Amino acid sequence: MTGVQTCALPILFAWTLKGMGDALQIGTFVESIVGTSASASLFLPAVLFVVAVFLAFSTGTSWGTFAILVPIAIAMFPGADHLEMMIIAVSAVLAGAVCGDHISPISDTTVMSSAGAQSNHINHVTTQMQYAAVVAVVCIIGYIIAGLVQIWWVALGISLMLLLAVLTFIKKKIGRAHV
C-alpha cells in the first residue's frame, strides 16, 4: 500500500462505522445508558467523560461525539438552578471526546500524524495512549470531585495538584532508574 492508501483506509473505515452508528441509532442508545446513571448525579460528570472517551475512541471522531453527547449533557441539567453542573457535564463530554479521539487508531488526526511522521501507525497510537491514560485517570478523579463539590474551579485546582503530584512521582521514579 502507498502512503495515501494507508491514510485513506482507516478514514474510510471510520466513515463506514459512523454510517452504521447512525443507522443503529447509537445516539439514542448512549442516551439510554447515560440516562440510567442520572440517579447517581454526583458521578454523572465522570460517567459522561468515560462514555465520551469510549464513543470517540470507537468512532474516531471527537466532533461526532460532541454532536451526540453535548445535547444529552445539557438535557440532564436543565435550568439556571443546575448551570454549574451543566458546565461541568459539558466539559466532561468535550474532554472525554478529545481524549478518545486522540488515542483512537481510526481517528483522522492520528492517522495523519503517524503518516506525516512516517512512523508505524500502531506504534504511534501506543505511545500516545501511555501519556493520555495518565491524564485520563486524573480527569476521571477530577470529574468525580466536580460531581461531589459541584464547583468547577475547586475540582480544577485539585486536578491540577493531582497531575503535578503524578508528574513529580514519575520524575522521581525515572531519576532513580537512571542512577
Task: Tell what function each PLM region has.
Residues 154-166:
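Small-residue-rich transmembrane alpha-helices that serve as helix-helix interface/gating elements
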